[in-house]
Amino acid sequence: MKIGNVEFGERPVFLAPMEDVTDIGFRLLCKRFGAAMVYTEFVSAEALIRDVKSTIQKLTISDTERPVGIQIYGRDVEAMVEAAKIVEQAGPDVIDLNFGCPVKKVAGKGAGAGMLQNIPKMLEITQKVVEAVSLPVTVKTRLGWNHEQLIITQLAEQLQDCGIKALTIHGRTRSQMYTGDADWTLIGEVKRNPRIHIPIIGNGDIHSLDEADKAFDTYGVDAVMIGRATFGCPWIFSHEELTFNQKLDILEELLRINVERIDEKRGILHTRRHLAATPIFKGIPDFRQTRIAMLRAETMDDLLRILEEVRTRLG
């Protein structure tokens, strides 16, 4: 499979772009464990062209994590084009357009999945971004706005005609948000459409490499993208069996990388999300107070001390 000039091996599994999750530390760890491609947190086009510092920082990438994509979102055509030009200068391998984020603060303003209610503008943005940059442009979207508007089959053809190099489909509508089950049947139908020649990447309800393999076998997609199941679990991209202590080592490393590459305050905030979600602490009796302490820690030393206490108790 290829996206532009970027080649992948068989059955590639990607890390999805996620706000406050796919910072550089987490991306580097996911890459180490086998993620075929990683994406930055999504980037607001409006904030980018206004030169907002925290947004500009999201463009920082490392050669170690390649291939890497930067995803942008917005509702204004000119802003999306200008943002894409800025992103191109950051040197990613791919620019991805987010037409799938369902959260109210994004979709409610007409961006992300909100574009599913304005297909002409979605196509205009896509066409103009493709024309404005030399990097491969890809799109991530959903099946439609709701179950009365399952438009993905036609939309995939329209986006392909705009010149995108790959399409990621999350198997839910915007109205579903993250409830119910992802419908991979429609993703498979898009892949089997004889008019479609770009890679189709499936996304939704993938919790392991075994489930990714089933998606490849059943629906014939070119790649699988994993999102929420990666929280606190960068080793999900590997079949390697890790001990509790090894997993704790990895989470401590994530903390150190984030503090070093971002700053202590925000690095801790980013790492807390993974500590709150990681499966390694689930089911541990009498763990509530320890969890609260982890999520309240304000310095790296305090958080490392708490994790060492956990290691002593459980490792």
Report the location of each language-model feature:
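Alpha/beta enzyme core
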Residues: 81-111, 120-198
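Active-site beta-loop-alpha junctions enriched in small/polar residues
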Residues: 18-20, 43-45, 73-75, 100-102, ...
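Hydrophobic faces of well-ordered beta-strands that scaffold small-molecule active sites
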Residues: 13-17, 38-40, 68-72, 95, ...
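Glycine-rich, positively charged N-terminal anion/phosphate-binding segment
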Residues: 2-4, 9, 18-93
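Aromatic- and acidic-residue-enriched carbohydrate-binding clefts of CAZyme catalytic domains
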Residues: 116
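Short glycine-rich, flexible loops that bind phosphorylated cofactors or substrates
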Residues: 47, 104, 233
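Alpha/beta catalytic cores of nucleotide-metabolism and tRNA/nucleoside-modifying enzymes
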Residues: 1-9, 19, 24-25, 124, ...
